[in-house]
């Protein structure tokens, strides 16, 4: 097993998927909305991006995928804020509807092949030809995309609108009393978050040079696991630190996932691996809190035994 190759593969996929984790960070951690349309939106971004790239516009494909994500987020937010539908149910409804839309975008097929299609990655490889970064062209594109999103998110959440979005997640009643419409901030937050998800799907499709209808299946679980791992690894702090925690968490998750693949683990077991990682990530903070209490109990028992022996 080539360790460097394994780490590079995990880093490339981790960075691309970290865009979805950052989307979940905005919607779930900041806005306090459980958006279950992530799977469908990811596939939508991949399908739209692949279709536009096949038409000969790889750069335009990125913008189109993000626009499709914005539209998906807008519909999800509209169901919640204007129709009184619970956020969980709204996400499920949109995710279900997106399956048919994604098939339609892909021309009625469940698989798109992009082997002969020029992508942002092939353009980057041609640009870096003959340099020391020739073999790292995918990694470079992923780093640029993630850096741009992290910087944007850090600056955006410091603006008045960004602060209003954060306040909406913390206390919507206070936001409402401050003459800020929480419905508006929810719509904007979900539109931005889903734009990141669409971008993530588009980049993964162009990286793999293929799109299947189930490319986004389980993505919300993967993103949640990565988010929780990032919180455990880097903890709380500034927006930039927390955003970087999402990137680190995505890489850590993909590293474990890639190792499982290299160990010839059956494909049907990988979903179980994802579930176990989620459980461990959620339970770790709890066990950290319980550890001092456990130590005190053990110390008390030792003290009691010492007195009993005396």
Kindly give the residue locations of the regions a language model identified.
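Loop-to-transmembrane alpha-helix initiation sites
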Residues: 13, 87-89, 116, 138-143, ...
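Transmembrane helix-bundle core of multi-pass membrane transporters
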Residues: 87, 91, 98-158, 187-188, ...
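Alpha-helical transmembrane segments within multi-pass membrane transporters and channels
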Residues: 24, 57-96, 249, 253
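Membrane-interfacial amphipathic/re-entrant helices at transmembrane-helix boundaries
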Residues: 1-20, 48, 54-60, 131-136, ...
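Cytosolic-side transmembrane-helix boundaries in multi-pass membrane proteins
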Residues: 170-177, 181-184, 256-310
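Transmembrane alpha-helical segments in multi-pass inner-membrane proteins
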Residues: 196-271
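Short loop segments and helix-boundary regions at transmembrane helix junctions
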Residues: 29-34, 74-128, 209-213, 225-244
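Helix-loop-helix "hairpin" substructures at the membrane interface of multi-pass membrane proteins
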Residues: 72, 135-215, 220
């Amino acid at each position: 097993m080539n360790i460097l190759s394994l780490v590079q593969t995990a880093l490339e996929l981790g960075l691309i998927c970290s865009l979805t984790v950052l989307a979940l960070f905005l919607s779930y951690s900041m806005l306090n909305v459980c958006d279950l349309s992530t799977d469908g939106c990811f596939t939508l971004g991949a399908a739209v991006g692949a279709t536009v790239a096949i038409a000969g516009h790889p750069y335009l494909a990125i913008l189109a995928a993000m626009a499709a994500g914005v539209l998906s987020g807008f519909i999800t937010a509209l169901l919640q804020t204007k129709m009184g539908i619970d956020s969980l149910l709204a996400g499920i409804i949109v995710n279900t509807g997106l399956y048919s839309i994604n098939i339609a975008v892909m021309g009625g097929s469940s698989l798109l092949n992009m082997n002969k299609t020029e992508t942002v990655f092939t353009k980057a490889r041609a640009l870096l030809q003959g340099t020391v970064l020739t073999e790292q062209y995918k990694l470079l594109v992923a780093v640029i995309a993630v850096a741009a999103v992290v910087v944007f998110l850090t600056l955006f959440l410091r603006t008045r609108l960004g602060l209003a979005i954060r306040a909406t997640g913390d206390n919507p009643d206070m936001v409402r009393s401050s003459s800020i419409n929480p419905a508006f901030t929810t719509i904007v937050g979900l539109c931005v978050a889903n734009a990141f998800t669409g971008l993530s799907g588009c980049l993964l499709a162009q990286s793999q040079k293929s799109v299947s209808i189930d490319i986004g299946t389980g993505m919300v679980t993967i993103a949640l696991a990565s988010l929780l791992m990032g919180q455990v690894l880097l903890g709380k702090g500034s927006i930039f630190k927390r955003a970087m925690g999402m990137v680190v968490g995505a890489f850590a998750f993909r590293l474990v996932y890639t190792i499982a693949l290299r160990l010839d683990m059956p494909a049907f077991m990988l979903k179980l691996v994802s579930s176990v990682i989620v459980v461990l990530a959620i339970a770790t903070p709890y066990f950290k809190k319980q550890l001092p209490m456990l130590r005190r109990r053990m110390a008390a028992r030792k003290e009691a035994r010492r007195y009993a022996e005396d």
